[in-house]
Amino acid sequence: MKIASFNIQKFGKNKVSDPDVLNTVVKIVSRYDIIVILEVVDASGTSVTTLLEALNKSNRKHHYTLKISTRLGRTRYKEQFMFLYRDDMVDLVGSYQFDDELSGEGDVFARDPYILRFRCLNTVLKDLVLIPVHTKPEDSEKELDELYDVFQHIKKKWRTDNVMILGDFNADGSYVSKRDMKKIRIRSDKNFHWLIGDDVDTTASTGNNHTYDRIVVYGDDMLKAIVPNSAKPFNFQEAFRLTEEQALEVSDHYPVEVELKSITNTIDNPDGVEEEEKPRLVVVDEDLMELKRGNLLLEREKLNLEIQILRMKMAKKNPV
């Protein structure tokens, strides 16, 4: 099961009104079972509806459902977190709008995380919590550190630590230094596993090669549920053979993605290494079945013959 986060860069009417851009976005989203889209800025909601309709028109076998936050932000500029997920692959079992002011930490987040909880139907991990992030660049260190408290709050609220934090962390370049990264609790706590390396370019622009977009999971159970080496950016410019100009019309970020192991294709071998399970074949030996049927016929004929002999003997003893 593939999960992704995508900062789509000011998603609104202008994006969906361009058929080429809309088509590319649909192709990107269609790669995933769950995707959270950042920077949804259309207050009317029409662009969201347009995308959902185009997505389901393009995906006949898998129906997508939408779950979107309220408009978030301190100023007139607002954004929404938009989740799109295949409802034959997961069930939405919980949603929660975190409010940092109610948590006692003050107004830390420019956009408070909108957190969803899913029951996964076909993966080794049944319970999954997704915490999306889009930090304000100049406050990214403080916001990322606060995510530790968000995690603890969710762990207590929902009694689970199967948590994935994903989104645009803005934790690179001039925003957060390597020294400052060490101060961030979800970085210094070794129970948190950062799946996207520090030297991975997640931007579509050739003007920089920063690692802004990240995926972080908590605990060994979550880490073991991840398909090895599946966490990476998806270079849609290369995959769809777009020019840089065409790619930047879609977004200045790449989606970052990860895959959870399927319950039907993994087994544990004696060495503790998980491998793909080979299909189990049920073979019917038709020759053997035919032989058994033949034996039954012979037994029946033998029985009929014995009955005929017995009748003949009875007739001799009792002549008419």
For each feature predicted by the language model, list its residue ranges.
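Amphipathic alpha-helical coiled-coil/zipper oligomerization segments
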Residues: 270-320
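Divalent cation-coordinating acidic motifs and surrounding scaffolds
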Residues: 1-269
